Amino acid sequence: MAKEELVEFGGRVSEVLPDSRFRVTLENGFEVWAYSSGRLKKNRIRILAGDRVTLEMSPYDLTKGRINYRHKV
């Protein structure tokens, strides 16, 4: 069985929440909950409010996502 296709969105972190979760405002104006990917946690990449990020989201639940890249300033 093939892995489901993920949808990528760009956005900006609007709030840092406990337990390495974030509230992200997407480029189209929607707000979603997001968490750091394992690669970001492993390499101890810090994500702060105001950072531009790229999210992966399931097409079945567009309210939650996984942050897989933090853009450079």
Curated annotation (Swiss-Prot):
GO terms for cellular component: cytosol. Keywords: Cytoplasm, Initiation factor, Protein biosynthesis, RNA-binding, rRNA-binding. Coiled coil: none annotated. Residues 1-72 form the S1-like domain. GO terms for molecular function: ribosome binding; rRNA binding; translation initiation factor activity. It is found in: Cytoplasm. Belongs to the IF-1 family. Component of the 30S ribosomal translation pre-initiation complex which assembles on the 30S ribosome in the order IF-2 and IF-3, IF-1 and N-formylmethionyl-tRNA(fMet); mRNA recruitment can occur at any time during PIC assembly. NCBIfam families: infA. This is Translation initiation factor IF-1 3. It comes from Cupriavidus pinatubonensis (strain JMP 134 / LMG 1197). The gene is infA3.
